[in-house]
Amino acid sequence: MKKVIIVGGGISGLTAGIVLQNSGFETHIYEKNPIGGGELTGWKRDGIYIDNCIDWLTNSKADDSEMYALWKDIGMLGEDIMMCSKDKFFSYTADGKTVTFWRDLERTRKEMLEISPEDEENIEKFINTVKIGEVFTVPANKPMDKFGLKELKKFMPFLKGMGAIRKAYAGMSLQDLADSFKSPVIGKAFTMMHPANTQAFSFIVSYATITSGSGDIPVGGSLAAALRICDRYKEVGGTLHTNCPVKKIVIAGKAASGVLLEDGTEVNADYVIAATDANHCFTKLLPAEYMPKKMKAVFDDKEHYSTFSKFHAIYLIDGKVGIPEDTSFWKCDGPMIGRTKMNACGTLCYDYDPETYPAEDKTLIQVKVIQYLEDCLEWIDLASKDKAAYDARRQEYADRLMAEIVKRYPEAEGKIRLIDTWTPATYASRCNSYNGAYMSFVADKDSKTVTTPGVIKQLKNVFLAGQWNMGSGGLPPAAVQGKFAAWRICKKEGVPCK
């Protein structure tokens, strides 16, 4: 039985481990944190559950898609796991008008036309393109660079659909899309969920996931999902070593002999999968020159590929004060959060999940504010050099956001309290995340998203897994990249990938 060491117990590492165990390998995952899951996680403060990750889960619909099958295989989803059904993507209110991106696409069309009949042509184009995007799915059985005619034929509707969307909004960012509308309320709504420099294509595909009914949330949230996946890995015979960081991958000629742990222990293996942040992999685990050329080109091209993260704050309110469940934004003349001047504020209200919100007479909300590179680096630097100043800034920003919530919902005055905050420095510390980013690169409107095969040409038995291998990242790319690393090992050994 061949032995595989997996560095990193996030969604990629766990997926690779489950697939390899099912395919007849012995696997060991080495994870630096007390539990597996990586950014798929949550925690408790004052007895209140705080969710870090899932706002919607692509390919969550129980169908015959490859991605749904993978979600089932690893324990993310299943017939016995209840789902929170999203009735909207989000809403935005300004100047007495509300734009809602409903799950019911026709309702969205109708309401947008009522707000701005003069935008009819633009609205119809947007709605019809979202309909096309409902074919979106994530190929999950084998890497796309290994597709043959059979796979190309199977995914032709998907490939044609994505091509049609890219053609319809070629060379357009979300800001460009927003500016194309005569209605400032409709236009501004498009820039609420994603950074304004994101390709319009990405927003359309994200929204289409909701309208297709394939973007719901498993009850219990991210931590429950992570623990299910960890349990599945152990059930199939895998060994998860927690609180066990890896110092480097040990190289012997054109192969790796294993890994060296931070405590000085050397562990040998036939294969190694680096299921970590890509920058961490090629600055700590392996020499920088081993980074694949396609990946390095993206890291080097800072003009067209950027990273971002967010400042997060969680609040608990005694009672119900009119905050709608799920995600809603409103126009405000808000404070500075880092270098971001808030002209809109939003809440994610967890009333939709009976297992995570605290009580029927309470309201739990999260506020997120985008932080771009300079702010992210400043958070990381401050956290490492002056913990007291870092904590003070977190509190200051949380107080500013609380004031905006009370302005919008006056009944919350005297009833709202801060539960917790976290920042780009949290992701950098916990997950070794590049620039504190919780997702991969944002490709601008003049660029293409890049998928890097998880192969290191100089090393015959080391493979890469993780969201940084695939487009803008996220949970589905992280999972499938773990599956693909396992697939490549199975292929080399001549065994079926299960």
Residue ranges and their predicted role:
Residues 131-236, 243, 430-445:
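Active-site/ligand-binding neighborhood in enzyme catalytic cores
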Residues 318-422:
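C-terminal segments that line or cap access tunnels to active or ligand-binding sites in enzymes
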Residues 2-135:
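N-terminal glycine-rich phosphate/pyrophosphate-binding loop and immediately adjacent elements
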Residues 239-240, 244-257, 421-433:
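Beta-rich nucleic-acid/ligand-interaction surfaces
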Residues 251, 491-498:
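Active-site-proximal substrate-binding core of FAD-dependent oxidoreductases
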Residues 467-490:
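A conserved FAD-binding loop/helix module that cradles the flavin
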Residues 217-218, 247-360:
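Mid-domain catalytic core of redox enzymes
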Residues 184-197, 410-471:
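A glycine-rich dinucleotide-binding beta-alpha-beta segment and adjacent secondary-structure elements
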